[in-house]
């Protein structure tokens, strides 16, 4: 085995000189033995043969021309010798034909279901929010939903349809245009798949096979007919793969030309396009991080090989790259593959915040300052200074910025006292009262509210206090609805056992030292209105003051963890009391949001809240998205007909009913094309075995495994390692990266999560078919091999089309009784 690396710039560009020389040496020995045994030919006889053959007029047969047209590798022909028509077909005509077929099967009957289908109820509603400019919260990044909003805008939709599941679209909602807009992304996947196969150097029959499998793959086909994110996600995933393959092949071409420049302008262009595509795919769904990981792993291997070439770790290998050129490779990749994608991702959130500038249904999940910046917000900031007796809601400033909440349900373990949680919706169980410390309680002094919100009865005027709360004051926090006090207990919290449990306990007459908290002011945000810029910094002010609550007995701080309670806690956020060394720990920071106190004067003019900081809101929103994603766990006590498990997807053990199943409904059943899915699954099993065989043959010096193009070598004993990496390893790694994470995830899973992985599986299938049909059958002549290949490819095209035609109604919509379609139920688990 060789130990050095060649000048190749892409992964797996190994220096195989020693290995290949060994093979050539064996071939030469065999040749010399044959030559010695055969004897010398007569010179005059040789001259006679040369003269005769020179007079021959050799014409290429029609079958040979057809063979070269279809089976010549798509990226290896010399345009000066190739027929111009072939160039036109590969670059223009073939992609147009495939795009036309893809358009027909995806647009056909796209309008037939005139009601809200499946997740159109979610994403159509989010598009409406953009048109109404009302803030909302969702677990996915904004780009895909912004595009849905754009489709509604272009369709003259006003955003006032509710998109309730199964509701019929009114006449003023041009749902057909919005579906076509979404379908456009699904259509473009086909020409991208074809062009990717062309760049990989496949012959035209293999390119068409891959394109046909993509066209008639019914998971993505069905999803592309509706207002969903899946087509956009798949398109940008495919585009990223296309750009990566382009970068790979350009790098190989540069090395083959012995260029001295570290990167050509064309390579830099495609690196930039790769970065743009990564930014877009991650801005549609976080599943885009999986194809980003594929690019990342490729880049790591690439840079490691260049490091080896630059610093010549193996002393036997010469230094093949300067340090400056190596650093240039780093700079280009950091800028194009990290900075550009991150800029696009952040920019989509910037647009998201700019468009959604009105209050909406999900304000309860937002920070107080972000709510205050929304037009029409319902913040009741009340008097500027908070006093004992004030009724308040208290919001966390941690990564899960919800309101502190309690309800009359107890912990099943620990103290078994009343639960304390954080809650993302505005509710009267979020309301608390600031009460004096225990010393005042022992003197029977209680701060109360003398208004409709008060829960106290009677009393003299002397019993009412409106003393302003200052930094360092001791307070008790009383839950308004249950009358119990917020406290910390010296037992482990239910989820985060390293911190103390927080509960509510007792009543207004209780005087327990465990109920006392100390106010520690951390910061005062300044209003842009000069009238509110001279407020006392030692006082607690609603909205603008950030403070911590330190438990007086235990010395720990009231905090959120970002974790959620299980079903007994209604999946609400965990609240704990923890020791915090750093005062800047935002999980221990709180602010007053709602403030009611009729004893105190209101400001002369309406309070203008401080402006929210974009980066803070960006981080908070992304963490909230992550927390909500993690909270989407299956309920073990509930049977979910729509969800499925990861092991069911490659074998199509289950499908998914996308809408109502009545006889009067147009019914859609989400299911992959069985033939295509099963072929791709078999290929996923065969591919590692094939690569293992290639590795064994290489190790035993039975084949050449060159880093360079071997198009002119005998395919029986030579292969291009770079092409092998691009054709087999990249798609196989893409499938693994898009599939294995769902095995590890605890969240609820659905069949459509397999769509990106299936795309990579199709390319693995194309590789295996191409590899098998290009084996060197030396005992047959070339004409037989050509006919054999044509028959096999034609058969594959035919059975793919027949399979699609047989199951077409699952994607085009089933009318009438579902009984009429029971013949499509090949497996008993398919609920057709």
From Swiss-Prot:
PROSITE patterns attached to this UniProt entry: MIR
Entry annotated with the keyword Transferase: yes
Keywords of this entry: Endoplasmic reticulum, Glycoprotein, Glycosyltransferase, Membrane, Repeat, Transferase, Transmembrane, Transmembrane helix
Example GO BP: cellular response to neutral pH
Coiled coil: none
The protein's annotated pathway: Protein modification; protein glycosylation
Span list, region Disordered: 1-44
Cross-referenced InterPro entries: GlyclTrfase_39-like, Glyco_trans_39/83, MIR_dom_sf, MIR_motif, PMT_4TMC
Any one Gene Ontology molecular-function term assigned to this protein's record: dolichyl-phosphate-mannose-protein mannosyltransferase activity
A Pfam cross-reference name: PMT
Signal peptide: none
Membrane protein topology class: Multi-pass membrane protein
SUPFAM superfamilies registered for this protein in UniProt: MIR domain
GO CC terms, sorted: endoplasmic reticulum; endoplasmic reticulum membrane
MIR domain ranges (all copies): 383-437, 466-522, 537-595
UniProt note: phenotype after gene disruption: Leads to supersensitivity to hygromycin B. Impairs filamentation, significantly reduces adherence to endothelial cells, and shows reduced virulence in a mouse model of hematogenously disseminated candidiasis (HDC) and using reconstituted human epithelium (RHE).
Inducers of expression: Expression is repressed by HAP4 and BCR1.
Matching PANTHER family: DOLICHYL-PHOSPHATE-MANNOSE--PROTEIN MANNOSYLTRANSFERASE, DOLICHYL-PHOSPHATE-MANNOSE--PROTEIN MANNOSYLTRANSFERASE 6
Family in the record: Belongs to the glycosyltransferase 39 family.
Protein name according to UniProt: Dolichyl-phosphate-mannose--protein mannosyltransferase 6
